């Protein structure tokens, strides 16, 4: 559970910005999206390998450029 206390003389905008940052760092939304539907372990592994391969290719292209 992410919670934020409002500091003295702090605007609501700044408080919301701090909340959003904590919310993102906690990974709440990412976890929710991952658990929205079931993915078989074999499919999950395949997706992770393909993502890893793409990430490696991009990193390799950046190094060569």
UniProtKB/Swiss-Prot annotation:
Species: Chlorobium luteolum (strain DSM 273 / BCRC 81028 / 2530) (Pelodictyon luteolum)
MF annotations from Gene Ontology: structural constituent of ribosome
Top-level lineage group: Bacteria
Name of the encoding gene: rpsU
GO cellular component, one term: ribosome
Protein name: Small ribosomal subunit protein bS21
Position of the signal peptide: none
Similarity remark: Belongs to the bacterial ribosomal protein bS21 family.
Keywords linked to the UniProt accession: Ribonucleoprotein, Ribosomal protein
Compositionally biased intervals (Basic residues): 48-57
